[in-house]
Amino acid sequence: MKHTLYSIILLFFIKIVSTYAQEDPLTTPRKDRLNDFTQLKVYSGILVNLIPSDENKAIIYGDRYGSIRVRQKGNTLKLRMRFGELFYYHNTYVDLYFKSPLHVVKLHQGASVQTEAPLSQSKFLLKAHEGAQFEGTLETEYLVTKVRTGAQVSLRGETSEHILKVSTGGVCEARNLKSERTQVCVFAGGEVGIFSDTQVEAHVSMGGTIGIQGKPKSVIARRTIAGEIYSQNQNTNRSYSKRNSRRNFNRFN
């Protein structure tokens, strides 16, 4: 009788453990099918891995994975936590598979995005705000990057033209991104590192810092109030002299 009772208890315990294991979001992720999208917006500290594919889908796992809201409107995909779960997002992950080229990526509220493979396309706009992070390899002809309010961006790859604006404590590490022409505007404590062997137009103000790696044939440097523009080449401590540029930097606004 006791043996039978112990067997029943053991089977009941195994069933409970098995049920919890099946419901564990780390082992049984949520899968969402998606329509085509060309713009991505990520919020709430969600960690996203971009994966080029022949299908559109989101594999969601980690803590409170059921609280992620996936919304599509037109060509825009939004990923965010439910309002009541905004403070519990530290271990929530999304593997995002996509078919069409991504033209726009906007990151807010500590969200983080990285690329599984190079993003190859003609144009790309990246915005990172509010402590968000982006790390990836790009192969583009025209790239616009805007980083502010403590966000951090790390770029690799190649582009023909790079327009870069960094402000309010934002950081952009782009020394591994080869660019033929770079226009960069940094202010209010922003920090930038870029690479160029051709042409650089740099404007810094109010404590911003721009480090230039490579040997650009043309450097137009402009400083306002405070800031620094200097060479980051090995054994070189050159600081670019102040030269007023006739170019209009309003296009960065």
Residue ranges and their predicted role:
Residues 1-253:
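Intrinsically disordered, low-complexity terminal regions
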